[in-house]
Amino acid sequence: MKQSNLLNAQFARRLFRTAFSSWQLLAVMLIVCMNVAVGSKLYAQSNTIAVKGKVMADGEPVIGATVLVKGVSTGTATDMDGNFSLNVASKAVLVVSSIGYETQEVPVNGRQFINVVLKSDVVTLKDVVVVGYGVQKKVNLTGAVSSVSTDELEGKPISNVLEAMQGTTPGLVIQQGSSTPGSVPSINIRGLNTMNNNDPLVIIDGIEGSLGNLNPADIEQISILKDASSTAIYGSRASNGVVLVTTKKGKAGKVEISYDFMYGVQQPTSLPKIADSWVYAELYNEAAVNSGRAAKFTPEQIAQFRNGGPNVNWVKELYHRNSPQSSHNVSMTGGNDQLSYMASLGYMDQNSMFKGPDYGYKRYNARLNVSHKVTNNFTLNLTSQFARNDIKEHAYWTEWIIEQANRMPPIYPIKNEDGSYNYPAGSNSNGLQRLEEGGYRQNVNDELLGTIQAEWEVYKGLKLIGSAGGRVWNNNLHENRKAFEGTGDSENKLTEQFYRSKNITTNLMVTYNTKIGKHSIGGLLGYAYEGFSEKQFSTSRLTEDSKYDIFVGDLSGDKVSNGGSASDWAIYSGFARATYNYDEKYLLEFNIRNDYSSYFAKGNRSGVFPSFSAGWRISEEKFWSVLKPYVPSLKIRGSWGLVGNNRIGAYQYMQTVSVKNGISFGDKLAQTAEFASTNPDLKWETTRMANIGFELGLLNNDLNITFDCFNNRTKDILVNLPVPGLFGNGAPIQNAGKVETRGWELSVSYRLKTGPVVHNFTGNISDSFNEVIDTRGTEIIGGSDVQTIIKEGYPLYSYYAYRSDGFFQNEEECQKGPHLEGITPKPGDIRYLDKNGDGVIKPDDDRFIVGNDFPRYTFGFTYGLEYKGFDFSMMWQGVGKRNKWMRGESVEAFHNNNEGPVMDFHQDRWTPNNPDATYPRLTMGAESANNAAKSDFWIQDAKYLRLKNAQIGYTFPQQWMKKLYVKNLRIFASVQNPLTFTKMKGGWDPEYTGDGSGRSYPVARVYSFGLNVKF
């Protein structure tokens, strides 16, 4: 399909070209300045002397402190006793630094022995947190911001960073519904605020990016911005929260090389629990008789199944027992006080658990981050990343393959005695053959992301900062699908697809920070532009011969399908921030942003998003001095503000046309045009956020507690309300909804040192609940097999179904009880509540709101132990309340008149001798109509507790490694997802996020080992 903008949004493209030119100019400036500066810095001094010294802090030697000669790359590091030696010029200046301490410059002045005493770096110890367009000390934060420690990422056999973040932060809801190679878990912050996209904004080094392509080993810090105070600076796309990622930077000192390696094997955490073949045969006979049919299996056949006959779990046969996974990461950092760098390479190889030729996911990462201090007040920074992910999979649909395998009875072998694939009577599918011989689909994605930043300190405290960056994403898809005779796939298919997107971002900011007595004042004023463009083309061809894996020939005809699209948008913004604190006790902050977006028509393009927050560090008051030994820190804070959401399709306020091949004349296809519904009055969704919280430190701040409660209300939600059929087109989008989301968060951390043993404990729990406030009185019902409703007074996307009321126990109950329209129930069938009391169960009259699948009471806790080089940690994560509507062959015996499946829980079915069963009487075909109705009987309790990761490691003593010229060496063993506790029936994973059919690639359990080494 080709989409064109009839009104030609020229201003978006004009701004895009202007910003791109600015980006090119800054790139040239960076290259010139770096070359001039590097070339001009020549170090030449005479009178070289040998200097020895010792670096101390708090009466103890500082191990590994960096000692550099100012202005050059000459340097060393202190040994186990804090000693160093260096040949320097007699008039040189030494720059001594170490993490957690203030950097000191020490003139040599001809001395041959120098003692250096480092002072604690107060800012470092009090923790700096990355926020929008800057950093702040954590103690002075007035917004709801959480940080994910990089310790959470280490030693875990993960394919993307989101898997490691799950359960680490309150209010951060991550669901890993599948471990499909290359897939990324879903992410949400503080629940659902809208009927549209609820994904948070992800910013990587100042550029919008993807967490799925990021190498976890490159990450320095992750900040989760959750309230208006912290997100309003991002304005129109911040209503769902913001994830800020800062990657590692270079540091002055000797070159340090790090290498990380991990190897593991994957196994499915859970698979459908299919009944054994002899049990299946017995229950099949019972279902057939209950349905007025003859029994199929004789007692002799059943005995044969029991005594060594076929007993095959077709779903299990789709997967390898063990599938390898490995990763390699190498990085190099170094530099001096003027230029520092960090370069890294990463490789991830995740084989598919599916059987088949060479399926899996490969990711290649390369990064270069450079910081160059051109002069004392002018600095240039470069961050750059290249990522390629290569996904190779089967050419069909995973849902289809799993569906057909799940429906296959265990009485049939998956292969015949001659090795050919078995197609039992009535079946047109063998999932294993589709995997092994059905062709392949390959997606190759390339991402190039980079930022150039120039920072000029015009005057003490006054800085001018300019940056430009971009992201280019290319996707190339190639598919060669092979047909199988008699399976319904009689023709081979070749597909080629290309997609490219470009994103350009520029920022210009002025910042000012000063301190006057006890008054600390800060300000920021900025301008930002972002432009995006994309285009896509695809073509498919049906062929008679599958041996050719290239796309050649005529591109038109009834066996060829072509399509394409293109779009672009732009947004430019002004923003400001003002901060004030008095003696670090009374804290104030104000943010505002004005966005101007091409998503909306003139007159509606501007959106203004302010926020205000305040905090009070009660523990810094004089009257608190008596309590200070018991409660050393206490802060209360609150915030209020507005943020926006413009995540709708482009051009929806304009009249657009779609052109496609719609009518066939002989062997030629004629093009047809479709005009979309429009609404020129569209405007921003706006979310009002309110938050109040406190932070409490006890036991000398070894025990820290943080609590927040919040209330968000979104108005003018962009939604397609139903329209009458006479309208003649799809419903136009309009601002017609309101949703309120309420919730709370609690996190606790505790550090305990008992002799040589250090214990670390962290835990968090949170909840959010949303309620639809207004849809103009309209109910929006969606879904087919699983139906949901958007209705005033209830959560978004609530399940909408009949409410079950046990089973009919006898004929009298069947005659007197309510029944589905047109169906006469029998004893053992599900009985439904008659909502309006007319005796007939009908969709329009008798459905209830019966649950919701969004997770509530999400929690996570970790325990870590360190003892003389040994370390152990475990991380648990779970959900306290969630419903999951399972359907089809995932729960129904003999679903849709198929031969299977029969699950383990079907054995506890209703019979006259088992009236208190958990499953209705067994039936098949038309006799199943009553029980197969959409009701809460099929909704399961999906709360769970899962051990996400456990690992044990050992770090070798430095005195051992020093002889091998190794700075640090750690070896470890780890397991991901080893244990799950859940009430879900049938072996289905409680994190499953699909449509309820169970047709999903499983979550993986991974056993691994690895090492971390630094030189």
Where are the predicted features?
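Short, small/polar-rich motifs associated with maturation and membrane association
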Residues: 1-367, 379-381, 449, 684, ...
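Surface-exposed loop/interface segments of Gram-negative outer-membrane beta-barrel transport/assembly proteins
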Residues: 139, 252-312, 352-447, 467-572, ...
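Short secondary-structure subsegments characteristic of cysteine-rich extracellular domains
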Residues: 358-372, 605, 609-615, 967-978
